[in-house]
């Protein structure tokens, strides 16, 4: 059994993680924080979550249980300062922010418009996509959970296996997200459900912080000096879910059936589902689940991949729970199936 402390448990991903943890009995939530909700019980704030009614929100500065695994569901600037403190105190840490994903400080500070004062800790973090880095995650003390958009693009491309060596240095990714994937709590009405009702628009064109993350992890060790990723996110008039369309070219037209390659890559993966046609991919198949659905179609040397996931689960809290399970030697699927 692992004891879990969640900083930022009152936010969207923090609440989702609490819901997932309530489905299992191996891990115990012993400490939750929210500066806005400090002093309130979990039962007062989220009566639908069946945890002990005396579990109470603390401020972020409150001392946490010494043996607990710490999950940071807080803004980037808070994670930058908090993660090193907890690591140096002997805690295992999972960070859901983007603070420790990128390995180039200049690129990070441009993408996030934020000075990184603890950049030496980036190299201590394992990028938390279990289907790619499972063995490293089993021995990790510090995990940087991937972005929701990033997961929907990086993982499908990675699963192409031997075809990745033939990638041309340009990928176009077009992603549509529910409002909870784009700052659902912001006071900007344009990012609220009422702001997107009967509406549809792009945002952060050529400036979204997940674009360099996608670029770094898709082209890692490729030898390509200047690969290009063009990533465009859009806001859908729905609450949760991401559907991504990824267009890439290979330097050859002679290669194996990409559906067969994906199926072979995923044959032992509990949360990856390969569908026969891209038209079958849709949000309702993945909402409220930890599944990532993928399909692909080939024309000449061009591949069009379509993927879908729930941004709050496989794109955030569910993937974090996969990582908690791996880091603590627990069955990976624990808490992730109803």
Curated annotation (Swiss-Prot):
> Which residues are in coiled coils?
none
Its function, per the record, reads:
Catalyzes the NADPH-dependent reduction of N-acetyl-5-glutamyl phosphate to yield N-acetyl-L-glutamate 5-semialdehyde.
User: Can the keyword NADP be found in this entry's annotation?
Assistant: yes
Q: What is this protein called?
A: N-acetyl-gamma-glutamyl-phosphate reductase
Q: Indicate the residues that form the catalytic site.
A: 148
The pathway entry for this protein reads as: Amino-acid biosynthesis; L-arginine biosynthesis; N(2)-acetyl-L-ornithine from L-glutamate: step 3/4
May I have one GO cellular component term?
A: cytoplasm
Family membership: Belongs to the NAGSA dehydrogenase family. Type 1 subfamily.
The record's subcellular locations are:
Cytoplasm
GO BP annotations listed: L-arginine biosynthetic process
Whichever gene encodes this chain, its name is: argC
Q: Which reaction does it catalyse?
A: N-acetyl-L-glutamate 5-semialdehyde + phosphate + NADP(+) = N-acetyl-L-glutamyl 5-phosphate + NADPH + H(+)
Annotated keywords: Amino-acid biosynthesis, Arginine biosynthesis, Cytoplasm, NADP, Oxidoreductase
> In the record, what terms sit under GO molecular function?
N-acetyl-gamma-glutamyl-phosphate reductase activity; NAD binding; NADP+ binding
What is the source species?
A: Leptospira borgpetersenii serovar Hardjo-bovis (strain JB197)
Report the EC code(s) recorded for this entry. 1.2.1.38
| Record's keyword annotation contains Membrane | no
Q: Which domain of life is it from?
A: Bacteria
């Amino acid at each position: 059994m692992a004891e879990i402390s969640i900083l930022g448990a009152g936010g969207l991903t923090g609440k989702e993680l609490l819901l997932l943890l309530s489905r299992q009995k191996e891990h115990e939530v012993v400490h939750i924080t929210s500066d806005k909700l400090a002093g309130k019980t979990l039962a007062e704030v989220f009566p639908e979550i069946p945890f002990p009614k005396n579990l109470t929100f603390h401020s972020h500065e409150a001392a946490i249980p010494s043996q607990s695994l710490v999950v940071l569901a807080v803004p980037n600037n808070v994670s930058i300062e908090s993660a090193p403190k907890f690591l140096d105190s002997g805690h295992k840490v999972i960070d859901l922010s983007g603070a420790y994903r990128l390995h180039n400080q200049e690129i990070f500070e441009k993408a996030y418009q934020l000075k990184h004062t603890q950049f030496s800790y980036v190299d201590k973090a394992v990028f938390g996509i279990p289907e790619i880095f499972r063995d490293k995650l089993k021995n990790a003390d510090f995990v940087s959970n991937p972005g929701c958009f990033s997961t929907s693009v990086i993982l499908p491309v990675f699963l192409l296996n031997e075809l990745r060596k033939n990638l041309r240095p340009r990928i176009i990714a077009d992603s549509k997200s529910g409002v909870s994937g784009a700052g659902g709590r912001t006071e900007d009405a344009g990012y609220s459900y009422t702001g997107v009702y009967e509406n549809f628009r792009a945002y952060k064109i050529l400036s979204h912080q997940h674009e360099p993350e996608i670029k770094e992890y898709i082209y890692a060790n490729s030898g390509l000096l200047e690969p290009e990723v063009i990533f465009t996110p859009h806001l859908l008039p729905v609450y949760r879910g991401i559907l991504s369309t990824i267009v890439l070219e290979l330097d050859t037209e002679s290669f194996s059936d990409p559906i067969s390659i994906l199926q072979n890559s995923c044959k032992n993966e509990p949360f990856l589902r390969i569908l026969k046609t891209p038209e079958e991919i849709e949000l309702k198949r993945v909402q409220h689940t930890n599944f990532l659905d993928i399909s692909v179609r080939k024309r000449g040397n061009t591949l069009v991949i379509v993927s879908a996931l729930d941004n709050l689960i496989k794109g955030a809290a569910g993937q974090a729970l996969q990582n908690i399970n791996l880091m603590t030697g627990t069955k990976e699927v624990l808490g992730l199936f109803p």
